[in-house]
UniProtKB/Swiss-Prot annotation:
It is a multi-pass membrane protein. It holds the Pfam family DUF2179. InterPro entries: DUF2179, DUF5698, UPF0316. Its main location: membrane. Keywords: Cell membrane, Membrane, Transmembrane, Transmembrane helix. The chain crosses the membrane at residues 3-23, 41-61, 67-87. The keyword Transmembrane applies. Belongs to the UPF0316 family. GO terms for cellular component: plasma membrane. This is UPF0316 protein Mboo_0605. The lineage of its organism: Archaea, Methanobacteriati, Methanobacteriota, Stenosarchaea group, Methanomicrobia. It comes from Methanoregula boonei (strain DSM 21154 / JCM 14090 / 6A8). It is found in: Cell membrane.
Length: 190
């Protein structure tokens, strides 16, 4: 196989695949930045993403008869979307509202979560199926969500909870206490 054949059969499809994976992943990251209100970061990511898109699309449109180029383009988009979702989980920007709903007295649960640094607000309500319920509202950094959910599923498996993204929080609001040792360890990814 000469270098020209290798380039058109293997190298260009591989380049297209890698470019599309990067471009689709960057699109996921850009969407996250937009939804969290980080307009400047979204713009910078959009510039890079568009440049990659132009190159990969240009390589495909140059010769539409090359099946492997088209296949690499499509496969790269799918793989990049999955990778983008994984990146979103890793960067965990922002906060979420967690609502815990329980028909029983939540005082033990609140004490346990409070000792772990979680702030919360409790209100009483009436459920259509369970009568009297307590609803506990918590605003939690997304980076802490998996820790909170593992505690809830392990220690309170029957607890009903819902989770929603938060767009903005008042600056200076104390919603989560993290002791200095944990803050230092989390800086190093521990």
């Amino acid at each position: 196989m000469d270098i020209g054949t290798f380039w058109s059969v293997a190298a260009i499809p591989l380049l297209i695949l890698v470019a599309r994976i990067a471009e689709a992943s960057l699109e996921s990251v850009r969407t996250i930045y937009i939804s969290k209100g980080h307009a400047n970061l979204a713009a910078y990511v959009g510039i890079v993403k568009t440049g990659i898109w132009l190159i990969s699309t240009g390589l495909v449109l140059t010769d539409l008869m090359q099946f492997w180029n088209l296949f690499a383009y499509l496969a790269g988009y799918g793989m990049g979307t999955v990778l983008g979702m994984e990146i979103e989980n890793l960067i965990s920007i922002g906060y979420v509202i967690v609502r815990l709903i329980t028909p029983s007295d939540p005082q033990a649960l609140m004490s346990r979560l409070s000792t772990l640094g979680y702030g919360m607000t409790r209100i009483e309500g009436t459920g259509s199926f369970s009568g009297s319920v307590s609803i506990i509202f918590m605003i939690v950094p997304r980076k802490e969500l998996s820790r909170l959910l593992s505690i809830i599923s392990r220690e309170y498996p029957d607890l009903l909870y819902t989770i929603e993204d938060v767009r903005n929080i008042k600056d200076g609001a104390r919603i989560f206490y993290q002791d200095p040792k944990r803050r230092i360890l989390s800086f190093f990814g521990m």
